[in-house]
Each structure stands twice: as structure tokens, then as C-alpha cells.
A protein has these predicted regions:
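Short amphipathic alpha-helices and their capping/turn segments at secondary-structure boundaries
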Residues: 1-2, 117
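Core catalytic region of metal-dependent phosphoesterases/phosphodiesterases
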Residues: 2-105
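Conserved beta-sheet core of the metallophosphoesterase superfamily
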Residues: 91-183
Length: 183
């Protein structure tokens, strides 16, 4: 069993292609690629922590998308999840749904939240990490200089993680490259 992290898939959200400069011709290609990439990595026995903004609005298709994805899916609620979550059948496809969660990934204490945070439980300790989403690949906002100094705050957004779920070690590697490239 492995643990994977992913955020900001925005299934069904055409504008996310333009907003984030995603390399897809349309939303159908984006959805197909995200599903294909997910299932190429994740087995049915794996846990996938989705750090928010899973989908956009269309609740009936959300349930169908979740059913196509391998693994036990844990949803950390994001700002774009509120609309589709009115469909209880779609929500029921997730193993758990919560706005904030702490887990152990090997010897690490990991706080999971859709939004980046300045501090979290034991954030000054070397074993404590934050994994978040929400910011996509945005390096223009006022928080960016601060975020580049936070080595144990990791962005699980698909826009910097090759549009697929990633392991903790892959998150570290991808975030270091992203921060270095944009600092």
C-alpha cells in the first residue's frame, strides 16, 4: 500500500486550462489525461489524499469520475468542492471528507489542508509537514516570497506535479524544482 497526494484537478472546469496554462485542448482531454495518469500510478489498495478542488459544479459526472479512479480517496475540502458536494452520492464515493486532516506518512506528521498555512501543529519540528493545494502554479501573489522559504510546506497541485498523484518524496522533489525555477 502506498500513499499519494494530489490537489486542484478541477475535473470538468474548462477555465482551469486557461487560468493555469494547462496543456490540454479542452476539458474532455484534461479529464481523460488526469484519469489515465491517476490510474497508471495508483492501485486499488493505495490511499490518495485529494487536497481540494477535485471538480467543478457538475455533481452527476463527479460521481462517475470518482468511480473511475483507483485507490481509497480521501477528500480535503477545497473552495470549488462546495457546489458538487451537494450531491450526497458523489460525496459517498470518498473514504472520508474533511476540511483538515493529520496523518502519518512513514515517520512524518503531515497536516493536510487545501489552503497553505503559515503554521500548523509542530510546524517548527523537522518531522512535521504541511501539504496543501489551492495556489496551482501561481507565483505572482504576495505570499510567494514567504512560501519559497517554507521547505516543509508542499504544494500538491497537479499543475506542478505532472498532472498526477505523487508520493511524498516526489512532492519534495517537484516542489524544490518549482520553487528554485521561480525564485
Amino acid at each position: 500500500m502506498s500513499i499519494f497526494y494530489i490537489a486542484d484537478t478541477h475535473f470538468g472546469h474548462e477555465n482551469s486550462i486557461r487560468f493555469c496554462n494547462r496543456p490540454f485542448a479542452d476539458v474532455n482531454e484534461m479529464n481523460r489525461t488526469l484519469i489515465k495518469n491517476w490510474n497508471a500510478k495508483v492501485t486499488p489498495d493505495d490511499d490518495v489524499y485529494v487536497l481540494g478542488d477535485f471538480a467543478y459544479r457538475r455533481a452527476t459526472s463527479v460521481r462517475d469520475i470518482v468511480r473511475q479512479l483507483n485507490g481509497r480517496k480521501h477528500l480535503i475540502i477545497g473552495n470549488h468542492d462546495v457546489s458538487w458536494m451537494k450531491n450526497k452520492e458523489a460525496v459517498a464515493e470518498f473514504h472520508e471528507v474533511t476540511p483538515l486532516l493529520e496523518i502519518k506518512d512513514e515517520e512524518r506528521l503531515v497536516t493536510l489542508c487545501h489552503y497553505p498555512m503559515m503554521a500548523w501543529r509542530n510546524s517548527k519540528r523537522s518531522f512535521s509537514w504541511l501539504i496543501h493545494g489551492h495556489i496551482h502554479n501561481n507565483v505572482q501573489d504576495e505570499y510567494w516570497p514567504l512560501l519559497t522559504t517554507m521547505d516543509r510546506a508542499l504544494n500538491a497541485g497537479v499543475d506542478i506535479n505532472d498532472f498526477m498523484p505523487v508520493t511524498f518524496d516526489e512532492l519534495i522533489k517537484n516542489n524544490r524544482k518549482w520553487k528554485l525555477r521561480n525564485s
